[in-house]
Amino acid sequence: MAEHGHNMWEEEPSKGRDSLDSDSSASTTSLVFDQISERVAAESGTTKGKRMRYGHDEADLGARLSELDDEDPLKDEASGDYDLETGPFLGGHGHNSNHDGLSAASGSAGKTQGGYRMMDRGLRRVLIIASLVFVTAWVGGLFIYISHKSYLHGSEFEHDPQATVSRGSLRKITREQVDNGFWRPVKASIAWVAGPAGEDGLLLETNASGASDKAYLTVQDVRSLQQGLDASTEAAVAAARRTLVEKSTFTFAGKTYRIGSSKASKDMSKVLLGVDVQSNWRHSSTAAYFILEVATQTVQPLIPGEVSARVQLAQWSPQSDAIAFTRDNNLYFRQVVAGSSSSAEDADSVIKQITTDGGPELFYGVPDWVYEEEVLGGASATWWSPDGRYIAFLRTNETGVPEYPVQYFLHRPSGAAPAEGEENYPEVRQIKYPKAGAHNPVVDLQFFDVGRGDSFSVAVSGEFADENRLITTVLWAGAQKVLVKETNRVSTVMRVVVVDVAARSGQAVRTVDVGAIDGGWFEISQRTRFIPADPARQRPDDGYIDTIVHNNGDHLAYFSPPENPEPIMLTAGPDWEVDDAPAAVDLERNLVYFLATIQGITQRHLYSVRLLDGGGLSPLTNTSEPGFYGASFSAGVGAGYVLLEYGGPNIPWQKVMNTPAAAAAAAAGSADVSKQMPFVHVLEDNHELAERARQYALPLLVRGTFDVKGHDEGVGAGKLNYLERRPPHFDPSKKYPVLFQQYSGPGSQEVTHEFSVDFQSYVAASLGYVVVTVDPRGTGFAGRSNRVVVRGRLGVVESHDHIAAAQHWASLPYIDGDRLAIWGWSYGGFTTLKTLEQDAGRTFRYGIAVAPVTDWRFYDSVYTERYMDTPQANAVGYDTGAVTNASALAQNVRFLIMHGIADDNVHLQNSLALLDRLDIEGVSNYDVHVFPDSDHSIYFHNGRQIVYDKLENWLINAFNGEWLKIDNAKPQGKR
């Protein structure tokens, strides 16, 4: 092609072809027919040597055939030699002995000329006609070949996630690449921080690599990322730059410590350093803490005289002069005075113990297991007031919560040495774990008055009983008021309470019974945002932004003052929802930023809207193309900068930009917002990943929806989103097996426009199977009516939808309906087994369940009862949702279960209960693999690697028909 500098009739050298055979044969054939073409051209008076063009006048060529009958097209005029195989141009000049032999042998078969056998005229005519037909076809094929850029190697094309045909011969992706992060997009991490005076656009930079030419912890102006700043900007950037911690190690009392975590005070004069950090549950950990003075780079222990004290949580006060921390489940207050002594004698003068009865069953300021996992989503249950006068904290009483034993056979997470003679016994960790219907922890909110030194709680009339209360949100709404959101234990009724801490009183300002509205539940969110009063900016009262149920979806509402139960709706839908909103609030310009599904539920774009009236909805991202974006905003009051993350469908990238200009450009209708920014810095473009995507054969992706019929229990028809991954060299005339991968949990989403090369991609691209992901009803972002249909019957609707999906794909001409498998992890493992049970071998043949729930009575109360109510109130729903029909599972060809023995989340009890039921019923068409000492993630001693090794090999055997052979095994010779 012209853009490559080649004449369209010259073949480009192949780049990295798997085989050169086709090129060689094509070249040889073309040279043969070039000779024929030259003769035709010569007889026609055209320039000798010019190649035949596609579309020549075939009638003219036909008229010349009779004149060519008497000529041998392979004769070399200079030598007079002939070779019917190769012709003289390939050096195949005839040898007289051969020709003589041929002539003698042929005898009367034809006339000879100059000692050579003459070809029969009729035969020559047939050969020439056939040759010209072949030439025409060959030239036509060459035209198509070049016009489609088939001469280019696949790696010369950009990766196209929307491609539906192969890009040619490329390298195969490998399991090792998927496992080791080769295909994982690089993501830079920015820790935004507000300056001491609320300055915007500052970030904390941690030298995690330990490079000797960089300080360990520094503060930078985000504009320092960009080159070529003007003098005034450079001066401002330099003024903002400061070093907080010089080195990644420090020495105290002759011992050197390596920093494991760091938390700077608000005024940036001190840093809290954690060393010897030890993980506890998903979010929590313990560490020994030191306080570093930035000016002198000197340290002192958090607890004077106790350098190695294990602390669960430590938080700076907003005034940077105190730290609240929890140790052994008790809450403490520590004054931080510059130059104070680190001796044990000074401990009493700087530390005050706020609570004294904390212990194994009573937690202060930190959550227990279920609150960490299901409610707060973090390790802190401590909240400082903005002026540092009060500390709000949760008291969690687990006295009535039953224990579950987690066994560790190969290591001892506690670090404690066993008693002599007990070395060969497992370590058992007893966890207070409330299962569905069991006693919940009793949680109440308490306050500590720093000035008065006393603790207190505030009773509010109409509150839920202790056993029926979940405190889901605690938010300071100014210096003296706290906004508290609480629900009943089954999450159908929510109360919003405003506590006046100074007056030690409170009132319920809003109560919503969503169960009565749509039969659903409240999802827990920690994104509620306080909006301070600012009369100069038309905000006469304090307020808050919350996500509420509106127009069949999750939408943003602005309540001001906080006691006002009637909000200003900032978003309304009705055919879209917000996601984990708000992302940020610009208090200087009264703008609210959020991610939403306006362009489709598989996409996320960033938008802004006016705070005061909900008007002026504007995109900050390019909505003309599919995209899945994320956003992290700067911590200043103006939220003036954003780390914008493009996650797909093309190669992911990250840019830092300033938001006011972005909003203005979007409002002006700019087609490419990013190019209109006064400040735009590409933080990561993933160019290496883009190059890999060009060089490797990635699966072909097909996204869409398909119709699903209504369920017989009052669930109407609907549309389900799917993602189909096809092999790179997909051939619709073939029959492919299908692996269905899913999660399916309430409110979750698997089918998106994100870029991903994962295990599913490997199965499609390198094993050659079709892999399909479907989001059934109950999953997220398709409207409340789509979600709440699973309430009270988890697994029933989801399995119905997956069976419908399997039936749909089985009906497609390129699918082998006898080779369908489904797999999933956690909730996906549950859905796998429930689908196999409900289908009973009619559609699916195989399944793999990793760490599955098998009976919702075994899972934690907060999560389960939100969707199922209690077992006492919904016994039928729990019975229906449990995987218990062993005879139905026996109808499948085979299934595989894998589980970690030390799973503290989905207990091994789930798999054991099912195995027992299978034993009772005499069912044996399954395999089991357990992982000692592995938790829900299955990492211990190479566990994660083995999970996917097992999954891959087991699946190959399934689709190869190996499990059919062992269904009725017989000794050799007895068949």
From Swiss-Prot:
Carbohydrate-modified residues: N207, N397, N622, N885
Active site, renumbered: S826 (charge relay system), D903 (charge relay system), H936 (charge relay system)
InterPro entries reported for this sequence: AB_hydrolase_fold, Peptidase_S9_cat, Peptidase_S9B_N, Serine_Prot_S9B/DPPIV
Subcellular localization(s) per the UniProt record: Vacuole membrane
Intervals, Vacuolar compartment: 147-975
EC number annotated for this UniProt entry: 3.4.14.5
Top-rank EC class of the record's enzyme: hydrolase
Region called Disordered, residue ranges: 1-111
Cytoplasmic side: 1-125
Compositional bias ranges of the Basic and acidic residues kind: 1-20
Acidic residues: compositionally biased ranges: 68-84
Catalyses which reaction(s): Release of an N-terminal dipeptide, Xaa-Yaa-|-Zaa-, from a polypeptide, preferentially when Yaa is Pro, provided Zaa is neither Pro nor hydroxyproline
GO-annotated molecular function: aminopeptidase activity; dipeptidyl-peptidase activity; serine-type peptidase activity
Regions crossing the membrane: 126-146
Record field: compositional bias (Low complexity): 22-31
Family as reported in the entry's similarity comment: Belongs to the peptidase S9B family.
UniProt-recorded name of the protein: Probable dipeptidyl-aminopeptidase B
Protein's organism: Grosmannia clavigera (strain kw1407 / UAMH 11150)
